[in-house]
């Protein structure tokens, strides 16, 4: 049974995720080259600790990874069917997923103590961020209560068929968020066949991307839409003032 959808034009109670009046804007950083997963996690955890201590601004870090799989806290080894790429065990919630070129990963480091300390509502806010981003390309993304992430209906594939276009996995440490979202812009979708994505084996539920849906969307297009939608839900952003050596030598502030 498919749950009632929530799409971009419906309203969620997300007002609590906007920052306090005296908060600094969220810094926005983009890495051009693929970032190795262990390096990204180490940098993310370092920045999150600085945010919790009040020594750094909140940060959204956009990047791509080289091809790899990650297993969250609910991951099952049986969901790795054909290990083609390295597998990394990680502290985020969720199960097994794929990351690689053509997929936009956004690591979101927000201080929820100063926003809204509610993990379920935070995940819903991330889903709504993705849904609003997809809406910029006239793609109707939907959320499901029993399937975290964002889905698109695929009647062309059969009745009740849906494909996942974006995944979510989060962790909180001292109420600062780690990890975040991954939107499929133009990844190699065949790489998902080596796993049971997010533990969902029902053949009605697959994986798609913006390009797979027939849209000529570039990563730069996706980044612009992500930033605009983020601002509506989480508040103002500002280009990172300089490359942060704790993040990545290949990172840049948006032009």
Swiss-Prot record:
EC code: 2.3.1.181
Q: Which residue ranges traverse the bilayer?
A: none
Task: Enumerate the PANTHER family for this protein.
Answer: LIPOYLTRANSFERASE 2, MITOCHONDRIAL-RELATED, OCTANOYLTRANSFERASE
Q: Which NCBIfam families match?
A: lipB (TIGR00214), PRK14341.1 (NF010921), PRK14345.1 (NF010925)
State the name under which the record lists this protein.
Octanoyltransferase
Classification via SUPFAM superfamilies: Class II aaRS and biotin synthetases (SSF55681)
**Where does the chain bind substrate?**
92-99, 167-169, 180-182
The note filed under miscellaneous reads: In the reaction, the free carboxyl group of octanoic acid is attached via an amide linkage to the epsilon-amino group of a specific lysine residue of lipoyl domains of lipoate-dependent enzymes.
Q: Into which family does the record put it? A: Belongs to the LipB family.
PROSITE patterns per UniProt: BPL_LPL_CATALYTIC, LIPB
Q: Name one Pfam family in it.
A: LplA-B_cat
Residue span(s) of domain BPL/LPL catalytic: 54-238
Any keyword Oxidoreductase?
no
């Amino acid at each position: 049974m498919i749950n009632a959808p929530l799409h971009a034009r419906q309203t969620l109670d997300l007002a609590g995720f906007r920052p306090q009046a005296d908060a600094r804007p969220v810094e926005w950083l983009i890495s051009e080259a693929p970032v190795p997963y262990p390096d990204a996690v180490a940098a993310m955890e370092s920045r999150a600790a600085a945010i919790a201590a009040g020594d750094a601004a909140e940060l959204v870090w956009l990047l791509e990874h080289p091809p790899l799989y990650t297993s969250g806290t609910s991951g099952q080894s049986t969901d790795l069917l054909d290990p083609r790429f390295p597998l990394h065990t990680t502290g985020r919630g969720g199960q097994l997923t794929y990351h690689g070129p053509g997929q936009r990963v956004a690591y979101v480091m927000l201080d929820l103590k100063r926003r809204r300390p509610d993990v379920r509502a935070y995940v819903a806010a991330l889903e709504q961020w993705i849904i609003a981003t997809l809406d910029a390309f006239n793609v109707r993304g939907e959320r499901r209560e029993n399937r975290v992430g964002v889905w698109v209906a695929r009647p062309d594939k059969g009745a009740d068929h849906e494909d996942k276009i974006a995944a979510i996995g989060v962790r909180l440490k001292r109420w600062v968020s780690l990890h975040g979202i991954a939107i499929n812009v133009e990844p190699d979708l065949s790489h998902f066949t080596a796993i049971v994505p997010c533990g969902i084996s029902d053949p009605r539920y697959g994986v798609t991307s913006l390009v797979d849906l027939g849209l000529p969307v570039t990563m730069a297009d996706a980044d612009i839409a992500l930033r605009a939608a983020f601002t509506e839900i989480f508040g103002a952003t500002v280009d990172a003032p300089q490359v942060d050596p704790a993040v990545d030598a290949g990172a840049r502030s948006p032009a």
